[in-house]
């Protein structure tokens, strides 16, 4: 992971991401990301548990405090560990909270994509989210989101997500390079995934608050 400001100054981080479905056949994930470098971030971690019927649960653990802190849904627009992603960016959107419109089709990175506009209709989400609209470029053949434009509630384009370097792993396409650009401050965060391992039989207890606070 690399953070870069408008002067070109870079800050590099290393982290390990663990992910598992909450239950077989249920499309809700448990995710744990634990940082290992730089030294001041070693052991810092974020745990996300997706929920179908309520906002996702997220906890932040900072070793210096020896305890975790639950992130309230009202803070979903805070920066995720100081990156250009917000906490709401790393949680899956719940389909029934949005209205979707097919806006057309365009090329993105040489791929034919459907362009989808996504607007929140849930009243609580409207208040808590920083965004008023998202515009998504989706590759229908590979089922990949290659770009997302984020607009604020005034309709101003504020952030852009792009993804590339697709790889077919066990019959499913995955993207190994992603970038989030904050256009307001010309700051970007890029993530390069490597050493992916699939179907490792991760213990569900790995995704517990107790384990989060153990720093394991």
Question: Language model features by range: what are they?
Answer:
Residues 36, 47, 57-61, 67-71, ...:
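Gly/Pro-enriched, hydrophobic low-complexity segments
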Residues 215-216:
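Short, solvent-exposed mixed-charge patches
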Residues 8, 42-43, 104, 155, ...:
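Glycine-centered flexibility motif
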Residues 211-212:
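Short, low-complexity polar/charged micro-motifs in intrinsically disordered terminal tails
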Residues 9-12, 107-116:
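Conserved long hydrophobic alpha-helices within structured protein cores
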Residues 16-22, 99-107, 164-166:
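Short amphipathic beta-strand and strand-loop transition segments with alternating hydrophobic
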């Amino acid at each position: 992971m690399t953070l870069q400001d408008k002067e070109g100054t870079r800050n590099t981080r290393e982290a390990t991401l663990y992910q598992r479905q909450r239950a077989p056949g249920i499309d809700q994930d448990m995710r744990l990301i634990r940082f290992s470098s730089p030294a001041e971030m070693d052991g810092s971690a974020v745990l996300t548990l997706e929920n179908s019927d309520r906002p996702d649960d997220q906890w932040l653990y900072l070793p210096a405090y020896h305890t975790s802190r639950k992130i309230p849904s009202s803070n979903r627009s805070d920066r995720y560990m100081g990156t250009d992603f917000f906490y709401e960016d790393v949680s899956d959107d719940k389909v029934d909270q949005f209205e979707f419109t097919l806006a057309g089709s365009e090329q993105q990175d040489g791929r034919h994509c459907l362009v989808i506009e996504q607007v929140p209709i849930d009243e609580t989400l409207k208040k808590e989210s920083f965004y008023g609209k998202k515009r998504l470029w989706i590759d229908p053949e590979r089922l990949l989101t290659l770009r997302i434009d984020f607009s604020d509630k005034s309709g101003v384009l504020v952030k852009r997500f792009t993804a590339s370097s697709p790889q077919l792993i066990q019959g499913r396409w995955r993207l190994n390079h992603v970038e989030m650009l904050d256009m307001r401050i010309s700051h970007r965060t890029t993530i390069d995934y490597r050493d992916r391992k699939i179907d490792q039989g991760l213990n569900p207890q790995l995704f517990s608050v107790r384990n989060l606070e153990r720093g394991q």
